[in-house]
């Protein structure tokens, strides 16, 4: 029985991304809850995908909604929302206004509206930060993304490359 297989090495996969111009992989260590390290790691001047750990993962400290709420609270204060796209408008402590998307939400119509928005974005200013869980590996590409912040232990480098692929 013939079973076709397609294999790529990391170079081939990364080389195939349309917008990826360079790649740097860094790491940060934290003790306790990862949320305490977010303020020193997150650069709100850069377009960032934050990939939170799986709820059953060792680095998860609360349910996924609480983790998202804590990340947003770390960024600043929610001052509004775009109900048609489910983008939160967040004011940072220094007064900067950021547009934050939440793909962790289980509400299907809400998540689909945000995913559709991500596919239609045609401006760098359309989004500043995107928080995701499993969808960080599939379903959208964000050409203006500058940083992927992946929290916790991942099963493989392949999973990390898949997440990086959303930002290409």
State where each predicted segment sits:
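Short glycine-/polar-rich loops that comprise or flank the Walker A/P-loop
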Residues: 44-46, 143-147
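Conserved SF2 helicase motif VI
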Residues: 155-168
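Short secondary-structure boundary/capping segments
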Residues: 12-15, 66-71, 145-149, 164-166
């Amino acid at each position: 029985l013939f079973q076709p297989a397609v294999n790529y090495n990391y170079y081939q996969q990364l080389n195939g991304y349309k917008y990826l111009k360079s790649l740097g992989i860094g790491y940060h260590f934290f003790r306790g809850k990862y949320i305490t390290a977010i303020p020193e790691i997150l650069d709100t001047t850069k377009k960032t995908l934050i990939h939170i750990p799986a709820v059953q993962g060792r680095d998860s400290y609360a349910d996924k909604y609480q983790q998202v709420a804590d990340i947003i609270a770390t960024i600043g204060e929610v001052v509004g929302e775009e109900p048609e796209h489910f983008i939160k408008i967040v004011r940072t402590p220094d007064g900067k206004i950021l547009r934050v998307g939440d793909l962790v939400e289980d509400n299907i119509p809400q998540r689909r509206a945000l995913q559709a928005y991500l596919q239609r974005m045609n401006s760098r200013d359309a989004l500043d930060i995107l928080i995701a869980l499993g969808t960080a590996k599939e379903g959208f590409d964000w050409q203006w993304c500058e940083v992927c912040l992946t929290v916790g232990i991942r099963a493989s480098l392949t999973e990390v490359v898949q997440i990086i692929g959303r930002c290409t």
